[in-house]
Amino acid sequence: MVSSAVKCGICRGVDGKYKCPKCGVRYCSLKCYKDAAKHVHKESEQPRAGTEANVEVVNNDKIINSSLAMNKTLKTKAFDDIYQNSAELQELLKYNTVKFHLAKVYRILSSTVNDGSSGKMNSDLQKELAVNYLNTLRYGGIHYNEAIEEFCQILLDKLNAVKK
């Protein structure tokens, strides 16, 4: 019987059961994966120019501080004014957990998922799913997240102040 599996890209002895998430090379064992002499990532040898000046990663991906992200403007003037004049929102948006969950809400709102009957999910259903997702992260939700709760409260207060 002929084996159709790909050989280990490091030792080339047996079938490569696993795949390196950084470089994509197939490997057979943890020993091959951690072999620093044979398994080298080309990206880590040559750091990209200018990356260190713009991004600072602080301990276990808790906070990412990017000087480029601070100078961006938002789509609407009202949201941009709120963002530019709120140090609290800017500080909360540095946390990866806030960015992650807001990106998920954005994906829900901008998705083109088929719902089975009408072809595409309508905007009302997308808004409902996004609100339900946020509600699970807010106070009393099953996945309560203090940073998301604080972000939502501050943003709602600022939006209500603009409406008045």
UniProtKB/Swiss-Prot annotation:
GO terms for molecular function: zinc ion binding. GO terms for cellular component: cytoplasm; nucleus; pre-snoRNP complex. Disulfide bonds: none annotated. PROSITE patterns: ZF_HIT. Keywords: Metal-binding, Zinc, Zinc-finger. Zn(2+) binds at C8, C11, C28, C32. GO terms for biological process: box C/D snoRNP assembly; maturation of LSU-rRNA from tricistronic rRNA transcript (SSU-rRNA, 5.8S rRNA, LSU-rRNA); snoRNA localization. SUPFAM superfamilies: HIT/MYND zinc finger-like (SSF144232). A zinc finger (HIT-type) spans 8-49. The keyword Zinc applies. InterPro entries: Hit1_C (IPR040722), Znf_HIT (IPR007529). The keyword Hydrolase does not apply. Present with 2730 molecules/cell in log phase SD medium. This is Protein HIT1. It comes from Saccharomyces cerevisiae (strain ATCC 204508 / S288c).
